[in-house]
Amino acid sequence: MTVRRVMGIETEYGIVVPGDPSANPMVASGDVVTTYATSRGIRPARASWDYADEAPLRDARGFDMGRGIAHPSQLTDVEDPTLANVVLTNGARLYVDHAHPEYSSPEVTTPRDAVTWDRAGELVMREAVARLATMPPGINLYKNNTDGKGSSYGTHENYLMSR
């Protein structure tokens, strides 16, 4: 059976700065993104994303929480100038997702292509880590799903389906 739909894979990577347990993971994640982008001549400029339909303070029932009582981490509609975000030449997106670097594959139409471009994301991250290793203490990335301290992250498969 042939699969005929648009799909993609997003992978969030765990991040650690060796020997520095107090390192800011958002800054370290930004270093991963900008190091790779710069090494490839990709300008790490902010892409314009349309968040007009998003309501980060609305729950599943449709009720809105007031901004004044929301925790700052819930105000995700406010742009953070420290976050790095680039679109790669293969159509993938490499960016900081909260406190993790994330590789979002290009949209594809076959499972084989989804796996191919997910593997490309691993190579992107490997190259970024190798380049950062030349500037101690370097950075370690993990393709697992928890850091043992309560933070979790992972991989998301995405499929375009008719309703």
Feature-to-residue mapping (PLM):
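Histidine-centered divalent-metal-coordination microenvironment in nucleic-acid enzymes
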Residues: N145-S162
